[in-house]
Structures are given as structure tokens and as C-alpha cells.
Amino acid sequence: MDSYTHNSIPEHGHGHVLQQVEKVLHMTSGVEENSYSHNSALQKTVISKVRPVLEGTVRALYSKENFPRYFSVADLGCSSGPNTLIVTYEMIDAIVGLCRETGHSPPELTVFLNDLPSNDFNTDFKLLPDFYAMLKKEKGNDVGPCFIAGMPGSFYGRLFPSKSLDFVHSSYSVHWLSKVPQGINNNKGNIYMGKTSPHNVFEAYLEQFQSDFSLLLRSRADEIKLGGQMILTFIGRSIKDPTSRDCCLVLELLAKCLLDMAAEGLIQEADIDTFNLPHYSPFIEEVKTIVEKEGSFVIDRLETFEVNLDGNDNEENKNYVFDKFKCGQNVSRCYRAISESLLADHFGEAIIDDLFERFAERIGEHLSMEKTKNFNILISMERK
């Protein structure tokens, strides 16, 4: 752990994260213990939940397009590590299976892996040789040429040529906003929407999501062919109230850890007051309203599902036994992997180990009393 003392409060908290989300935000790089690559079991569980919808949609789309020779897809917010290529494999598997059943030749497939420029694309690219070898071994001549490329940039804006994509997918990315909402300097003691947040904070977060999500839809409408499909999965909330427990509880616990550190003189409370996460968990009706208002897509499916907060507590892990300490560590490392870049940029790297040790203890205690789940929204849309 980096050292710091009670008498030497780090001089960070410049608030520049407000304007530099695109430059700062990334999942923790590499393959070490605290990396996203090692702490993304929750995200893998979400991908597995969506797999039947993904495969059914890809099969129906490829058939509807009359088995085209070329098929182009994009995965938005791909991040880094082993999860990155799971969706690509599932799409290939669906197409290969359909071609086998119908006697058609497999297409040439182009896959664009998109994330912000600060993403660890190098880790992703290092996975490609083994991935291509696995495809050849498992599918043989049943799989056509597959070209996988990185496409750095924000999906809140254009990324690809007009009408160049057949299918777009995104998992656990759209809840990240393009920037922290403006005008929420009065959100004292919170790092997100919370029970004590003033009303204008809720309004600002919703307005930023409306703006960002509308821009995402407009951008993809230009890039997806008519009749093409898009599937998005992201964190949401179960009720309209923006302070619902499935929306705010975990981040309120993280904020309490920061406030404890401020009370001990380890960080400045003013720095907490100027830090807010660029994140929004929408209510399902908010999503539906934005899609209908933007007007470029028809909603095929709009549904919700839940997964346990500890990604290791899933249907595939039959031997899972709850352990307060281990569960707290699992959840803490997951949240560290997704938020460390923003927290370290604002508060300094020296506090990160201590912060997430405290968070592991708090979240473990909470989960020993109450099983908490992540509430998710799945939307499948067709380009008009």
C-alpha cells in the first residue's frame, strides 16, 4: 500500500474529472490481482444471462438478410480481458450453427471492439491469436474469415461509416455517462444520487442520461443498416424513485467509506463534495420514452433481470457458499476495477488500497444481513 499519514492529506480533488471522463475512465488494466480482467465475474454472469436473446437475434437477422457474404458487428464498451471475446464467440457460434442447418456458406465476419481510448486494448489484442486458433480447432471450415479490430472512441458520437453495420451489441457500458452532470456542486457527502441529494441532482443526472442516450441512438442510426439490430444491457433501477436501494445503496456505502477517511484526516471532505460519478441507472420507462422520442429504432424486447452482487454467486457455481469476508472482497474488487481510474484521478492513488479494504468490510457486513442484487435492463431494437 502507498504510504500516507494522518497529518499529510493528499492534495488532490481538483474536480477536473468533470471534463475529462473520456480521457480518464477505463477499467483497471492488465492481468494482476486488482485488474478488471481478474474481477469481472459479475459482467460475465450478465453476458451469460443475455446469451439466448443475443443468439436468437443474430440468427434471425442473418437469415432475414438472406445469408449475406459479409456481416459486420460492433461491441461497444468491450473493456479488456477474457469477457471481451465471449460475445464475439457467441455471435460466431450462432451464425455457424445456422449455416450448418441451412447449408449456406459462412460469411466473412468483421468485428469492431470499441471502448474509450484509455482502454487496455493491448490485453485484448494479445488474446486474438489463441482465439483464432480456438475457432479453427472447434469450427474448422464451418467458420469463414473473421477480422477483429479495435475502434477507440466514445460511443456517444459517430464511430463507423454510414450504413456499415449489421449488428451492434453493448453490455454493462451504457450506464456510464459522457460526463458528470453539471450544476450538482450541492451534492454534499454523496458521490452519486443518494437519499440526501437535493432534487436538482436527480434532475441533472436524468437530463445527462437523456442527452447521452439520445446521441448514442442517433449515432448508431447513421451506422446501422436498415433492418439491422442493436442489443444493449445496462444497470437500471426497479422503480421510478431515483433513491431506490437497487440504484444507490452500494455507492452510498462507498461514499461512507470516503467520509470515514475524511473524518480520520486521510482525505479532505471538500474533495468528496466535488466528486460525483458519471453514471446513471435509469428506470425502464425512461429508456422506453427516449427510444420512442428519438424515433430511429423499433423496440423488439424491453425487459429486466437481476443478478447477485457477488458475480461468483451464480447459477453455474453450484458449490458457492456465502462467506462474509470473501464475498466482501469479491464485490470490492469488482467495484475497484470499474471505478479506480476515476477515484485515483480525483483523490490520488495513495488512498485506493485503504478505501477498498474498508469498502470490502462494509459490503461484506451488509451482504451478511441482506442479499443484494444488481437490477439490469435489456433492450433489443431494430433500425427502422
Pin down the residues of each PLM region.
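N-terminal charged/capping segments associated with class I S-adenosyl-L-methionine
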Residues: 1-163, 175-197, 232, 237-238, ...
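Soluble or luminal CAZymes and related metallo-dependent hydrolases
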Residues: 46, 208-212, 279-283
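Conserved, well-structured core segments
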Residues: 111, 166-172, 288
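Short, conserved SAM-binding segment of the class I
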Residues: 163, 212-219, 223, 290
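Mobile active-site "lid"/loop adjacent to the S-adenosyl-L-methionine
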Residues: 170-215, 224, 238-275
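Intrinsically disordered, low-complexity regulatory regions of nuclear DNA-binding proteins
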Residues: 212, 382-384
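Substrate-binding/catalytic lobe of Class I Rossmann-like enzymes that use SAM or dcSAM, i.e.
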Residues: 226-351
